[in-house]
């Protein structure tokens, strides 16, 4: 009888629904707290509602899944026939999601390997896809974890935000950095480094910042085979145009995904976000 390894991630991977269905990946939702309402990302709050709330400066916070939600997910997957589970999550530097999964894994009916990928958005999504493809090929839990970790090591993520205010409010970047990024109309470029959102460059205007984001992503891709994801929040035209330019500039491009981030990431970046994830194959 063949073994079956199941892949779990969380809602901040922002994987296309068709990819999750095709590979049998389960995503556990994080929570967005809007005023006095706790809403599950992906099902109970739209990015449009989030953007409107942020623009009106309504209080918006986020929280990790309850460990019991992970426990229920692991039980359900085990009952469906899985012999082992690989649970891949956004950076533990940014969220307590990984810790909640670890708590639940201790009582799971099958072995669960919980992995802090150090990633976020499709940087996490590409790790989940790599693990799922390995599992589908008959790989063990350890082999699926290795595939995800290898993918993470070859993945970079870069972001443009209109302002650092939202990251500062959420504690994802230092107050001094946020103050500097807001001064003199500076437009910040950020990167995912060591599992944290760190400053990369400061550019004077939005158009120059987006052009520089494109240049950085194209240089990172080089000529080797890569997958790319372009993310945005309330900026679909900018994202589509950036994706088109990257198609022309990246000779080794395999797959390119364009998607709007969900409410959890959006709550910390604000409207106008553009992000590019470059992942080596």
Curated annotation (Swiss-Prot):
Keyword annotations: Lipid-binding
Cytoplasm is among the record's keywords: no
InterPro entries to which the protein is assigned, alphabetical: DegV, DegV_C, DegV_domain_contain
Residue ranges constituting the DegV domain according to the UniProt record: 5-280
Binding positions for hexadecanoate per the UniProt entry: 62, 95
Keyword Secreted: no
GO MF: lipid binding
Record-linked SUPFAM superfamilies: DAK1/DegV-like
Record's function text: May bind long-chain fatty acids, such as palmitate, and may play a role in lipid transport or fatty acid metabolism.
Record's protein name: DegV domain-containing protein SCO2569
Organism: Streptomyces coelicolor (strain ATCC BAA-471 / A3(2) / M145)
